[in-house]
């Protein structure tokens, strides 16, 4: 994700072959090679799509049917018949957290994803078709990915897609368990990788937190201690920085 630390983006671009997820057009100024952009659409229009394509962006993620319809309308226009894009549909996930126990706000219901994938399978403008989802939790119980993918998406859908992007959410260190928990998480991911390889599906990850976290240090203030609990003023969390950096919520 380029939004949270744009100063690192040029370094990553020069020294790796990774892609960059981008949420708003203003962030594109940090990336020289726009073909490495994975643009996550939100309430766009055909003019914005045309501008993005003109800059060389061709990888898109849509998380609602309305934005998908706008994209398909753009591709239908006669002057755009030669445009080739790579498209991923973002699917909702149910996360069994203590706070929510509900589906994440962003994303298309998996039933609709199954239907739309089959409709889009043979579109001449779409050179690669995939599914995207993203964890917002670090709960260990949420990493049984093979089981979830098999239950969320039909066999026909899995045969139709080229790529599965499981987003991020990978832990650096869990505060409430042992530091070796990452091994269990990545064992689950390897299981999914084997499962996807059997179906000729490319597995994509977004390990930003896992890579960046060891280099950062949170300076905070302990406001209270009671029983076995410590209350801290973690201002980065309290101010909801994502909402300030990416004003689309």
Predicted regions mapped to residue ranges:
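Active-site-proximal beta-alpha core segment in soluble small-molecule metabolic enzymes
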Residues: 1-163, 191
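Short, small-residue-rich loop/turn micro-motifs
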Residues: 91-93, 168, 236
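Conserved protein kinase catalytic core
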Residues: 96, 138-140, 174, 212, ...
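Glycine-rich beta-strand-to-loop/alpha-helix junction loops that act as flexible
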Residues: 134-136, 164-173, 207-209
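Short glycine/threonine-rich loop-to-helix capping motif typified by GTGT followed
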Residues: 141-146, 173-186, 213-224
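Oxyanion-binding "anion nests"
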Residues: 163-165, 184-193, 201-211
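Substrate-binding and catalytic surfaces of secreted/luminal carbohydrate-active proteins
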Residues: 198
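Charged (often Lys/Glu-rich) extended helix/loop segments that serve as interaction or gating elements
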Residues: 202-249
């Amino acid at each position: 994700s380029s939004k949270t630390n744009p100063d690192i983006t040029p370094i990553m671009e020069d020294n790796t072959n990774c892609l960059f997820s981008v949420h708003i057009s203003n962030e594109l100024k940090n990336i020289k090679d726009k073909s490495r952009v994975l643009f996550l659409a939100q309430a766009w229009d055909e003019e914005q799509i045309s501008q993005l394509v003109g800059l060389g962006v061709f990888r898109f993620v849509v998380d609602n049917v309305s934005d998908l319809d706008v994209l398909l309308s753009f591709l239908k226009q006669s002057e755009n018949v030669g445009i080739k894009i790579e498209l991923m549909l973002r699917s909702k996930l149910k996360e069994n957290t203590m706070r929510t126990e509900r589906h994440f706000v962003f994303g298309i219901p998996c039933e609709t994803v199954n239907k739309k994938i089959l409709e889009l399978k043979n579109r001449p403008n779409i050179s690669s078709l995939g599914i995207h989802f993203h964890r917002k939790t670090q709960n260990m119980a949420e990493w049984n990915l093979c089981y979830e993918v098999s239950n969320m998406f039909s066999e026909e859908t899995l045969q139709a897609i080229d790529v599965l992007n499981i987003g991020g959410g990978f832990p650096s260190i869990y505060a409430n368990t042992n530091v070796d928990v990452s091994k269990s998480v990545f064992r689950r991911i390897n299981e999914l990788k084997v499962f996807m390889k059997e179906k000729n599906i490319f597995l994509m990850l977004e390990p930003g937190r896992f890579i960046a976290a060891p280099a950062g240090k949170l300076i905070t203030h302990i406001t209270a201690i009671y029983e076995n609990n410590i209350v801290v003023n973690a201002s980065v969390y309290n101010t909801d920085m994502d909402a300030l950096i990416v004003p689309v919520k």
